[in-house]
Amino acid sequence: PYFPAGFGTTPFIINRRVDRAAPFGTGQYKVGGNYASSFRATEPAHEQGLGVLFLDSKEHKYIDECGGANFFGVRNGVYVTPKSDSILPSITNRSLMTLCEDLHIPHEERQIPVEELRLMQEAASCGTGAAIATISRIIDPDMSTMYGFGITPGPVCCQLYHALQDIQFGRAEDTHGWNLLLENC
């Protein structure tokens, strides 16, 4: 798995000193240069067993993304994910929002102020490598704050994770045409 805990929980730390992508830059594209600058923040965090949560480069007050993965949180049963021109539009995140519709889970794509983390019951990163990697807590050292989400994945994350895995592994019907069967490979 992408994170050592797999579909367990991983702690994260907010980094306000390094920007993953420049405003009006190429953050929305899969370009190596977008991630090279973030190594200065991710390597020391990973040595401490932490993932990194990056904020918007312009104001440093809105959640952007988790290292190389998208962020989402659950607030009162609503799946909330950042809307930003500086993050890669994740296929996994789009798939999870589609599954939210299937499962009648409301979802929003909008700017998320850091302070809103205190109102969320669940938080996770999502992307190709991790599918969903839930977040146990987010430490904000600059504000001397910690936001806790529990030591086990929450109910919405579990529901979405299992729905996605069931489609990927053929245990549930793929009504969206996401899977492609390759024969004679």
Predicted segments, located by residue:
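Helix-start/capping segments and mature chain N-termini
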Residues: P1-C185
